[in-house]
Amino acid sequence: MAHHSCGATHGVMERCDLACTSCYLGEEANASRPIEEAEVCRQFDALREFLGPQGKAQITSGEVTLMPREELGRYIRYAIDIGLDPMVMTHGRRFLEEPDYLRDLVELDGLEKISIHVDSTQRGRQEWSPFCTETELHPLRDRYARLIRDTRRQTGRRLHAAHTVTVHPRNLAQIPDVMQWMVRNLDAFRMISFQPVAEVGRTQDQSIENLTLDDVWEKVCGGLGTKINRDAMHFGHPECHIVTPVVVVRSGERFIVLETARKGKRWDRSYLRRLLDQVGGYTVRGKSRMTNILGITSLTLRNPLLLLETFLYGIYRSWGNRRELASVLLRAVKRGHLSVRPLVLVIHKFMSPGELDTPIGQERLAACTFKVPVNGKMISMCEMNATELRSKLYPRERIRKAG
């Protein structure tokens, strides 16, 4: 079974064609050539050893879609072949300009996961202005949602999409607007990650003084119209991130958010734990929907008591939300449409340089669940970006490429 953590590449393509006002890359990034393919594969090998089978590996660096599709495709195929679950991290501009680029990654190279970064820090986009709001970027987000739907339809393949948003002083109050857009587009995106600014790399935006995870979480909940338990699941240090899965039942503009583990509800947590113990090792990559349904059903049938509990728990949860569900279902009867979609809510708070050597910073580094392979070691992404380590790698990478 895979470790409960995530890893990432570096040096694959440090260059980026945007000039985001919040950027973890160093000043020399755009002059740094990509490292050799063999070295990238060694990074994947290290990630596979560290993360285990189906480990979540982000193919990231600067903007990796600046590479030829064939080259990025080779990295995706290699990661899959050695047993990783790769996700391409991108601002996605090339996908809009060349839709075939994404289609080929999905159809020819087996890509199943992407994360698209859109927010008001992204200087260089045609849609960007110094004072643009997140709401003004919704038409751009709509284009990506259509692209994802079109790619699935044209290829007949699975494509899971996440949305990444940097949180800075100017857009903190706009998070509810982004969440409301997200609810309307859960058929395209099923995960959203908010990442408060860290004063690293070539970042120009200031971090928000004394901003806590709870401050951001309050804005997320505001957009969903309900207070959600932030402690449904735990990964790493509690000051690093929040990861909370929910289910959204929606008809038109009316929706209800169903939590996986409500605060103070013991049965929620104990049932979730037993369910994950039973099916947590099952992987869906490379299998058809029917195969996955049969596989998960088979696992559940091996534990008749859990199957019975699932039935009873479903009644219990439906009764607890009967009024809200009735309102949505009545709307669905009138409109003839009802959707039930999963949504994973993520907040990831990277550290600035001044935080690393504090007692809490050292605790966070020791508990880190997001690492990159550097010189034979797995290094926290915070250590990679909040020190000179990333920049120190640039000259060596150029020398290796030239040699």
Language model region names:
Residues 1-100, 104:
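Conserved alpha-helical substructure of the radical SAM core
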Residues 27-34, 128-137:
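Short glycine-enriched, charge-decorated loop/helix-capping segments at active-site entrances
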Residues 208, 225-260, 393-402:
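Catalytic cores of nucleic-acid editing and processing enzymes
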